[in-house]
Each structure stands twice: as C-alpha cells, then as structure tokens.
Amino acid sequence: ACTSPGPDEVTVLTTVTETAAAAPQSEPEECANPDARIEDTALFTSSQTVPFHGTDLIGVPTDFSRFLFLFSPANMESNFDPCLPLSWAVLHGSNGDAERGPAGTGSSIADVVVFFHYDELITDPAPSEIRSIEDVTRLGDTTVQVIHGHAGRSTAEGVTEIYVVDHVWRDGRLVTEGPDAARYEAVAAETVNLTP
C-alpha cells in the first residue's frame, strides 16, 4: 500500500542529467573553403585570364588592353591561405601581348604581388606591377609588409627606389599604410594594373 508523506516528511527527488558531448565546432564562416588551392581562385579561373597554349605562361590582362602580364605558375611564390583574412602570392613575369608572348626586353620584366581575402582574389584595388618584390613578411592575420623595388630611372640602373609598405585588410577593403605608402601609391598609379 502507498502512503502519502505526512506534514513533517520531505520527499527528495534526484534528477540525473547526462551531459551531451559537445558538438564539433565548424570552421568559421570566412573559411568556408579550407581546402581551396590558389589554382581555384579567380587568378587562374577568371574568364579574363588568357592562357598561352603550348607554354606554361598565363597572361593576365592589364589596364592597357593590348598588353598582358605573363607569368609562369611554376615561378610563383604562393603564400595563399584560404583561412586567413589576408594572404598573397608573388608573380614573377613579363609584359607582352597575346600574339607574340613576352616582350623579351629588360624593361618588360616585372613582379606583381596579388592579395587574397580568404579564398577571394582582391581586385579593388587592382594589383600593380613593379620592377621587383624584394621581400614579403606577414605581420599579422590582416597585415602583410611588402618591400617594393621600383626602377625609377633607366632600365640599366635596375631598382633605384625602395618602398616599405604595410598592406592591411581593414573594414572590408585593402589599404596601404606606413611611411612609404604615399610614395608607393603615386608610383602604383603610374604603373600597369592587372585586371583579373
């Protein structure tokens, strides 16, 4: 028979709770494609990229419609990372055109550093070519320091000016900072820009 507790009796209920295993954390939304390769980006897949058949060169149109910046993927220094807000690749190449290929002159040789926001090629501002990229250093997830070498005088003199510039991803865009940023921006405005 069941009896009800009296006024001086206490009923104690014990609740057993099992802790569910924590759900695995997903990758951040920004790193939606952690397995992406640089070859999967617009640098290689853009319909504006001009492949050169029979060679390992890829031509990227410039802001001068008849010129192309030609580079070999085998001669590219890639620091592409689809899970970082800012990564880069240095392209070593030459100016030329679609019919004749590289110009083959000393003044046509150039470097371009292209930047990526996660797995997206940054095209605004457009990448600018310069005589040489002397060095690139990551200063943080959103900051990359580039030492740009500019041939400010004759081709025979080679690099005559050095610009140390911090390229920073801030507020949804790529900006330049540092003591040489204004001088670099002036030179970049006068050089060929890629239009990937």
Where are the regions a protein language model picked out?
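Short, low-complexity, disordered segments immediately C-terminal to signal peptides
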Residues: 2-28
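Solvent-exposed, non-transmembrane segments of extracytoplasmic/periplasmic domains
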Residues: 29-128
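Exposed, interaction-prone regions of secreted/extracellular proteins
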Residues: 125, 133-134
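Short, intrinsically disordered low-complexity segments
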Residues: 129-130, 148
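Extracellularly exposed regions in secreted/surface proteins, prominently low-complexity, repeat-rich
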Residues: 135-196
